[in-house]
């Protein structure tokens, strides 16, 4: 049983929350324009369950595609598929079982959202191959991992607006930053086996690159606030969120590249940032 918990990464739930928070931001933003407590809570629950399912399926699929790469990387060589403890066939069966409840959730939404949700499949399928062909797999993950922003808005309004795009790109730059931090754990091994990442591309200018990513996210959140007429407190709280990201960059600069535990802790702290933005958005429903 524990093997399947490990295969689905349920023992490492940080990825579930990083996938869920952008969905929650978007769902909460809809309530700035039309308050429907029942649907809001219902969709939050469905999106959270969906995040668990899709993150698990994505991890299994990535492990299948990256089997040979994972075996050559110190941090991942003991993963169940890479080590041969679970067969590729069993892994595919696991994905099949996960897709069924995911589709059940998706098909509760309107037709626009169904098409939008299904279209994310192309990004999910393509993502694991990006590290082989470009130094920007983290950017591609950003576009993939934040698709829930578009979906969260569309389940209420059946469209995509400028506000949605701004929030989507907020998540993309945030993911680009935090996944670059995550990739630092494997930088030495990735250089040896020629796996590409932004952690490698910007290894000599990491601080400036991370600041670029995080400043872009905060700037977009500020722009969103002005566009939607947010309250003064919104901008104060966004400034506090900006400090959170700033401290990440400062701390990561002081960590040695072989200290994977500390790198992981900085990466994990993004769960707090995601929660903070959700709470800021939630407060705006009633005080904005």
Locate each region found by the language model.
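Cytosolic, membrane-interface loops and tails of multi-pass inner-membrane proteins
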Residues: 1-4, 59-86, 180-203, 251-262
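Intramembrane alpha-helical segments
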Residues: 2-6, 25, 49, 56-57, ...
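The first (N-terminal) embedded transmembrane alpha-helix
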Residues: 10-29, 146, 276-278
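Alpha-helical transmembrane segments of integral membrane proteins
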Residues: 14-18, 38, 42-46, 50, ...
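Residue-level recognition of pore/gate-forming positions within transmembrane alpha-helices
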Residues: 23-24, 51, 99, 121-124, ...
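Helix-coil boundary and interhelical linker segments in multi-pass alpha-helical membrane proteins
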Residues: 25-48, 101-115, 149-169, 219-235, ...
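Multi-pass membrane catalytic core of lipid/isoprenoid biosynthesis enzymes
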Residues: 46-51, 67-117, 173, 191-232, ...
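Extended hydrophobic alpha-helices typical of membrane-associated regions
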Residues: 219, 223-288
């Amino acid at each position: 049983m524990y093997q399947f918990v490990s295969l689905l990464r349920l023992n490492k739930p940080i990825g579930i929350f990083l996938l869920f928070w952008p969905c929650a931001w978007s769902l909460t933003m809809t309530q700035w324009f039309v308050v429907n407590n029942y649907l809001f809570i219902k969709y939050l629950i469905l999106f959270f369950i969906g995040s668990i399912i899709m993150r698990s399926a994505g991890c299994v699929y990535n492990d299948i595609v990256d089997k040979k790469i994972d075996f050559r990387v110190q941090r991942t060589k003991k993963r169940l598929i890479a080590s041969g403890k679970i067969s590729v066939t069993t892994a595919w069966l696991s994905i099949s079982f996960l897709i069924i409840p995911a589709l059940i959730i998706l098909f509760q939404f309107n037709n626009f959202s169904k098409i939008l949700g299904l279209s994310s499949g192309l990004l999910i399928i393509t993502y694991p191959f990006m590290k082989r062909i470009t130094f920007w797999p983290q950017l591609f993950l950003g576009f993939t991992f934040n698709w829930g922003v578009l979906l969260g808005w569309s389940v209420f309004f059946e469209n995509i607006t400028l506000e949605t795009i701004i929030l989507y790109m907020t998540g993309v730059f945030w993911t680009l930053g935090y996944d670059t931090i995550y990739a630092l754990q494997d930088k030495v091994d990735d250089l040896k086996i020629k796996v590409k990442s932004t952690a490698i591309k910007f290894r000599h200018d990491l601080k400036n690159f991370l600041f670029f990513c995080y400043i872009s996210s905060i700037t977009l959140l500020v722009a969103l606030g002005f566009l939607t007429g947010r309250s003064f407190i919104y901008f104060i709280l966004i400034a506090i969120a900006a400090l959170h990201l700033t401290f990440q960059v400062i701390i990561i600069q002081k960590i040695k590249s072989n200290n994977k535990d500390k790198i992981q802790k900085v990466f994990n702290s993004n769960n707090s940032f995601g929660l903070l933005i959700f709470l800021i958005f939630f407060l705006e429903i009633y005080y904005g």
